[in-house]
């Protein structure tokens, strides 16, 4: 009886701990690489890409989601709206419009380490 009880407690504990996600892997918050792009074609949401607007691409966040993006190198932040899918390069979490990249000081480097947080 005690062995069964211990087995059940161990199974429940393992299941509970394995379902917890670290903050960085939650789709609403994260850190990783970002790049910028300035296409003039349509985005995955169907709107025309405008490099002068504060927008970004993310693999899974809903279109229209507002996200605060902070450049980890200089602390500068910008709020962008998700309107596209991507990036599809390992280690990158966001593709920013040129205007958004300019606001956080990453146009010349092309890429930067960023953290992002969903705000609405």
PLM region spans:
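Secreted/periplasmic proteins
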Residues: 2-120
């Amino acid at each position: 009886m005690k062995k069964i009880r211990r087995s059940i407690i161990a199974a429940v504990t393992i299941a509970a701990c394995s379902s917890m996600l670290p903050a960085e892997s939650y789709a609403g918050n994260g850190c990783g690489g970002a790049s910028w792009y300035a296409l003039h074609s349509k985005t995955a949401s169907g709107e025309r890409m405008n490099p002068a607007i504060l927008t970004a691409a993310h693999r899974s966040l809903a279109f229209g989601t507002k996200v605060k993006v902070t450049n980890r190198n200089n602390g500068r932040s910008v709020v962008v709206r998700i309107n596209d899918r991507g990036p599809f390069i390992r280690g990158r979490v966001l593709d920013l419009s040129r205007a958004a990249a300019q606001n956080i000081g990453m146009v010349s480097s092309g890429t930067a380490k960023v953290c992002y947080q969903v705000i609405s």
